[in-house]
Amino acid sequence: MSVADTKKGVEQKMQRSIDAFKSDLAKIRTGRAHTGMLDHVQVDYYGSMVPISQVANMTLVDARTIGVQPWEKPMVAKVEKAIREADLGLNPATSGDQIRVPMPALTEERRRELTKVVKSEGETAKVAIRNLRRDANEALKKLVKDKEISEDDERRASDDVQKLTDKHVAEIDKLVQSKEAEIMTV
């Protein structure tokens, strides 16, 4: 394993951590509707649980309503039930073969709770990034110990890993700030 492999590997892992954090943020409900909120809803499709996106089209009707159109008529009741039981605080309403999912307005107290959740998720993501930095630095130290690289190379590589860490932590901070602003916007 070379220095380049170590740096490339840690950067890929950090990016995956950022992507996982983004998907976690997408699940946190804001006052506005977006189809990504329903991505993790699982529907019973003839005995097996599948994501809602595999049995229905989802569209935005307006800023506060998601329209869900199951591809098969018999699935309407099952999709509605799955949305209701997904613990998102949503109350879908069916009209024919179309399901409308209105977003209830968030209270000020709930908004504050959600910003705390966002900050907590952000801290968890930062810890994951820092753990990746630690692992990379340990791998570099092992390369020095095995006499595969010099201490100067290790120091330069450690600085590069630190720069990657700083870049990804700053990206997490930016994502947290934008999500908080989105939540607090009435």
UniProtKB/Swiss-Prot annotation:
Location in or out of the cell: Cytoplasm
CDD domains per record: RRF (cd00520)
Keyword entries, A-Z: Cytoplasm, Protein biosynthesis
One Pfam entry name: RRF
Disulphide connectivity of cysteines: none
Gene Ontology biological process terms, A to Z: cytoplasmic translational termination
Molecular-function GO terms, alphabetical: ribosomal large subunit binding
NCBIfam families per UniProt: frr (TIGR00496)
Recorded family membership: Belongs to the RRF family.
Protein's UniProt name: Ribosome-recycling factor
The organism of origin for this protein: Burkholderia lata (strain ATCC 17760 / DSM 23089 / LMG 22485 / NCIMB 9086 / R18194 / 383)
